A protein has these predicted regions:
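GST-like fold's C-terminal all-alpha helical module
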Residues: 106-199
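Acidic/histidine-enriched, glycine/proline-rich intrinsically disordered or flexible terminal extensions
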Residues: 202-213
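Short, solvent-exposed turn/loop segments enriched in Gly/Ser/Thr/Pro and often Arg
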Residues: 16, 156, 203
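A generic membrane alpha-helix/interface feature
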Residues: 51, 60, 125, 170-171, ...
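Conserved residues at the C-terminal ends of beta-strands
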Residues: 65, 162, 202
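Residue-level detector of family-conserved "landmark" positions at structurally sensitive sites
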Residues: 39, 72, 178, 200-201
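GST-like domain detector, emphasizing the conserved glutathione-binding G-site
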Residues: 1-141, 147
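Feature targets compositionally biased, intrinsically disordered low-complexity regions
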Residues: 1, 176-178, 209
Length: 213
């Protein structure tokens, strides 16, 4: 799989076909129009050269010439600084700080619930599913304020949210009731972006097959 392989300098990304963190990096790369060769790896059979580049053998791992980066947050912020246009973070320090805090909260509050839903005991998964659904619906007022999450422009915060929202059918979460209209509108806006569509693996496309927003 390759994203925009004819643009700018070609990088290499070790990615999983269905992983929220890998998905974040693929969205950011597509937004930047960066040439990248994407290597989809089997987590049960990691390539030896990955450990030569990343001592932890974790996914995603980005290679840019002699630089190897791992951890999605580090990778996407590096990409935003390495390729300034289009910017995916606010210009002003206070706004940048708020964006970083929001990304941290999304990971701590929502990604953690997603992990429980996917791999936790049945009772814990059911509780996490309810908590995640209610928490997502509660942000509806924020989504009424701007086209993207607390911003007029697509940002790294949206890169964090999009992979999570795309997987709601997998989590067994249906959106209805108060706040669902606003959230669904926001989701469609994200999912219809050219960069988001370019970021999807075949595995990820199948996640929503027959599961419209």
């Amino acid at each position: 799989m390759a994203v925009a392989a004819n643009k700018r300098s070609v990088m290499n990304l070790y990615s999983h076909a269905d992983d929220m963190y890998s998905h974040q990096t693929r969205i950011a790369l597509a937004e930047k129009g960066v040439g990248v060769d994407i290597h989809l790896v089997d987590m049960d059979n990691l390539p030896d050269d990955l450990f030569e580049l990343n001592p932890y053998g974790t996914i995603p791992t980005l290679i840019d010439r002699d630089l190897a980066l791992y951890e999605a947050k580090i990778i996407i912020e590096y990409l935003d600084e390495r390729f300034p246009h289009p910017p995916l973070m606010p210009v002003y320090p206070v706004s940048r700080g708020r964006s970083r805090l929001m990304m941290h909260r999304i990971e701590q509050d929502w990604y953690s619930l997603a992990k429980i839903i996917l791999s936790g005991p049945a009772d814990a998964a059911s509780k996490a599913r309810t908590e995640l659904r209610e928490s997502l619906l509660s942000i509806a007022p924020i989504l009424n304020e701007a086209p993207y999450f607390m911003s007029e422009d697509f940002s790294l915060v949206d890169c964090y949210l999009a992979p999570l929202l795309w997987r709601l059918p997998v989590f067994g979460i249906e959106l209805d009731g108060q706040g669902s209209k606003e959230l669904k509108t926001y989701m469609l806006r994200l999912f219809e972006r050219e960069s988001f569509q370019a970021s999807l693996t075949e595995t990820e496309r199948e996640l929503r097959f027959g599961n419209p927003v």
